[in-house]
């Protein structure tokens, strides 16, 4: 009897040990792909470098502005929350804008300084991601933007050009959060007042954007994806309160999840060069995320 008890205990211990070892191995670095266990380094080759299969901050593009470059320094810190089916992401975003030549040009530096996320098992498998949560500190890409005022006219319209570069400084490519590859885009933004009262303190403005967006991929044949960048919307001001709404996105040529678009809404209140900013973004097509953010901007 004692012999059978000993054999049973040893058997159960072996089963339990094997079960937890398999779970630990799967969580650490391996997932079954179509019934075949693959190391995370091999699964990185299966990543799809498009907005549909990456995190919410992997493919940034221009905010639709009113076509005028500001003449004040701006330092912004913004907390953001993004939610899609099977993915919840929170991050801290920072931005510094420096005007040049009294608003005739400008330079902006920005990026996500910290990000955390939680993906479902289904989303992890769909994206071929290694982990569902960040195993280490996750940081985003550094973005450098330059602006040039081409036309500034209260009577006709304002026209602004921008050149933008996203570096490969972000990490967690293995989790499909950032691409670890550079991208760049150029755009022209135009704006015109529909009406303007009280020296511009009450105004409604129509604005639009058109440009070119390009990013590097892991495709062995077509190493980059090119896209048409677009946007249209309205902005307004009522003394210390400003608001904006637009529909923007870009459209790539590969049709592999590269057609993201977003409805963006912004409400801001300014008091003595301090701005409180509330934003909401509703993703459509290949942008699967809805986003909400609260930001503070200090002007100098």
Residue ranges and their predicted role:
Residues 79-83, 111-117, 150, 163-171, ...:
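Transmembrane beta-strands of outer-membrane beta-barrel pores
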Residues 14-22:
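C-terminal segment of classical bacterial N-terminal signal peptides
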Residues 50, 64, 81-87, 131-135, ...:
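Outer-membrane beta-barrel domain signature
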Residues 1-9:
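Bacterial N-terminal signal peptides that target proteins for export
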Residues 120-122, 127-132, 221-224, 228-300:
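Outer membrane beta-barrel transmembrane domains
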Residues 147, 155-157, 202-209, 229, ...:
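Residue-level detection of beta-strand scaffold positions
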